[in-house]
Amino acid sequence: MESTIDLSELLGRVRKNMKLLIILPLLGLLISAIISFFFLDVKYQASTQILVNQKGNDSQIMAQEVQSNIQLVNTYSEIVKSPRILDKVSKELDDKYSRSEISSMLTVTNQAESQVLNIDVESKSGSNSEKIANKIAEVFSDEVPDIMNVDNVSVLSTADNTGKQVAPKPMVNLVVGLVIGLVIALLIIFIKEVFDKRIKTEEEVENELVIPVLGSIQKFD
């Protein structure tokens, strides 16, 4: 006969393993804290924006150029990451960072149907992230007229005072560690209860054998 576990019995088994439910989540919390504060590199991100916009007075011409500029944004996002731009950025930063290093720090994004390019730079220093982002925007806006034969780029906003820590995120990591510890504890309890076939109580004897218990023998040391 298959035995069923009611809610009170389930809660009883959980209470029986309360030490495990406390120790493993706390252990996960401790491990996450150690990793977050001592092993993960701190990263700061700074952002600047580039506007792709041809100056003009005729409204009809401007409307056409807006669509043209939007189509060019994807091309410009690739130009920002090109060796021509990044090599010059590296040179103007006194070769403190190589082209590949700058490329690994750089992320270029834009919203759909937008003329704005977002340039994000991540490094181990907020001030360095700001400096590199500003230099990329400056070099790009200077080089585009020569590359594309059109002067339709301007710096919309600089990266000054935008540097902020983006990694690690200790609170998120601590919560994740706590949850992982709790899940592991519950899995251990579940596996232990499923594979432990021993009969431990009078109720389990009655449920398993469907006969009344006449008496019990106490354990002697």
UniProtKB/Swiss-Prot annotation:
Per the record, membrane topology reads:
Multi-pass membrane protein
Biological or metabolic pathway of the protein:
Capsule biogenesis; capsule polysaccharide biosynthesis
Q: Which GO molecular function annotations are given, in alphabetical order?
A: carbohydrate:proton symporter activity; protein tyrosine kinase activity
Can you say where in the cell this protein is located?
Answer: Cell membrane
A Pfam family this chain is assigned to: Wzz
Establish whether keyword Cell membrane is in the entry: yes
Look up the coiled coil feature and give its residue ranges: none
The UniProt keywords, alphabetically, are:
Capsule biogenesis/degradation, Cell membrane, Exopolysaccharide synthesis, Membrane, Transmembrane, Transmembrane helix
Q: Which InterPro entries match?
A: Bact_polysacc_biosynth/exp (IPR050445), CpsC-like (IPR005701), LPS_length_determ_N_term (IPR003856)
GO cellular component, alphabetical, reads: plasma membrane
Q: Which residues cross the membrane?
A: 20-40, 171-191
User: Is Cell membrane among this UniProt entry's keywords?
Assistant: yes
Q: Which GO terms describe its biological process?
A: capsule polysaccharide biosynthetic process; polysaccharide transport
* Role, per record: Required for the biosynthesis of type 1 capsular polysaccharide.
Protein family membership: Belongs to the CpsC/CapA family.
Q: What is this protein called?
A: Capsular polysaccharide biosynthesis protein CapA
| Gene behind this protein | capA
